[in-house]
Amino acid sequence: MIKIKSKWIKIFLLVLVVAAPAAAKPFYDGYSEYRKNAVPVLEYHSVGGSDEWPAEVIIKTEVFEKQLQYLHNNGYSMLSMEQMIDGFKNGKDMGKAVVLTFDDGYMDNYTNVFPLLKKYNANASFFIVQSKIGKPNYMGHDEITELIRAGNDLASHTINHNILTDIDPKYFAWELSSSKFFLKKEFDMYYVHLLSYPNGKYDEQVIAAAQQYGYNYAVTGKNGAVDKNWVENHPMEIGRVIIKGDMTESEFESKLERSYLLGYLKSVVFGSLFFY
């Protein structure tokens, strides 16, 4: 996979606007069309957890609610991964939509997030570290079951959150296949086929193993909205917009907007080339 750093995106746009004005209109026309059915996938972790945790994994509950308010007030539907995937499969007009995802399975996803999902008529996908179920600060069987019954997704974040690109491939079966098995067994044969790579780290070998063990879709830490074409052709590399706890409201809005442009460049202009 080729990675294109953000500075090259800026250079590309500058060249497009300044040196090739004739190409600008088709570009922006295509971008406008892309936006109609592109969906940013938002990545969260803890909501309202310990202030000692880094901003990458925690956001204050009141900040999270302001983000939901912004999305609701601006006409966004807030979906789970399954709802987005089904919408793309069935040719649904997605309109303005985002997907909400939560990694790790923290208890505050139940105590703080779940009530707000119900308040704003939203759904989400919860990527669970299987070995953490029922441990201190993590959701247990009853909490996860209630989330599922409310229409949210149960998904895998592996057994132990080991970084898959850093471990011996002989352990892939344990981290990937066993996670599916135990989640399915504990939650009434729930169909687990969504994966979040720990720390967003993956490579071609990890993708092949995940598909071998029955995962149909996986989310990464690479920015950019996704459309039907991307999800169909790159189901194991669905990018997400990482939402950090120290973001201001304007930064959240800007990052959401920027994800459409990054997704368009990735999906339409650069094809299968990646950047971050």
What are these regions (language model features)?
Residues 136:
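Core nucleotidyl-transferase/polymerase catalytic module
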Residues 127, 157, 218-220:
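Short beta-strand and adjacent tight-turn residues that come in two discontinuous sequence segments
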Residues 114-121, 139-155, 229-231:
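Acidic (Asp/Glu)-rich catalytic clusters
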Residues 132-133, 141-144, 148-169:
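Histidine/lysine/aspartate-rich catalytic loop segments that bind and position anionic ligands
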Residues 123-132:
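Juxtamembrane helix-loop-helix connectors linking adjacent transmembrane helices
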Residues 106-107, 160:
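Short, glycine/acidic-enriched loop or turn micro-motifs at the edges of active sites
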Residues 2-6, 21-101, 107-108, 166-276:
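C-terminal active-site subregion of NodB/CE4 polysaccharide deacetylases
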Residues 9-16:
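Sec-dependent N-terminal signal peptides
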